[in-house]
Regions:
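A short, Lys/Arg-rich alpha-helix, primarily the initiator
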Residues: 18-52, 129-143
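Short, charged recognition helix plus adjacent turn
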Residues: 1-13, 97-125
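Key DNA-contact positions within bacterial/archaeal DNA-binding proteins
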Residues: 54, 65, 94
Length: 144
């Protein structure tokens, strides 16, 4: 199923000037947040689908059973576990922020030293091991 990107929707919205057009736009099925949970959002991402569960488990160093419990929604992952999965999947900062929000965890904070390092690791498309090495290099706790 094709999902409109936010940018595409913003471009359409920029040209709407009447209430009738606005109402038609809001009725459009793509103008909803179809993701109310972390697992549904995470599994919908192209990079996650491309890698597959086995590779994500390997790259994130999560226990296989824990990973599947997260994806089934029977376990709620902590912030570091979500970050491990996002790094393993090579998600963008925007995708990672959304994943953190949907999982009920705090987004990366630009005034927090550890979060700054993690943001740079995400921007560099670093894996979990490289992110942990970067954290350790600057005296911060590695991802749990």
């Amino acid at each position: 199923m094709y999902e409109s990107t936010t940018t595409q929707l913003e471009n359409i919205l920029a040209n709407i000037s009447s209430e009738k057009q606005m109402e038609e736009f809001m009725e459009h099925p793509k103008v909803t947040d179809s993701f109310h949970s972390f697992p549904k959002y995470f599994e919908s991402l192209e990079s996650v689908q491309t890698l597959g569960s086995g590779e994500l488990i390997k790259r994130s160093s999560l226990e296989r059973s824990y990973y599947y419990q997260i994806m089934k929604g029977t376990r709620s992952p902590g912030r570091d576990k979500v970050l491990r999965l996002c790094l393993a999947a090579g998600l963008t900062l925007r995708e990672t922020t959304r994943a953190l929000e949907l999982s009920g965890n705090a987004p990366l904070y630009p005034k927090n030293r550890r979060d700054i390092i993690l943001t740079v690791a995400i921007n560099q498309k670093a894996g979990v091991i490289d992110a942990n090495l970067l954290l350790s290099k600057y005296g911060e706790e590695p991802l749990a």
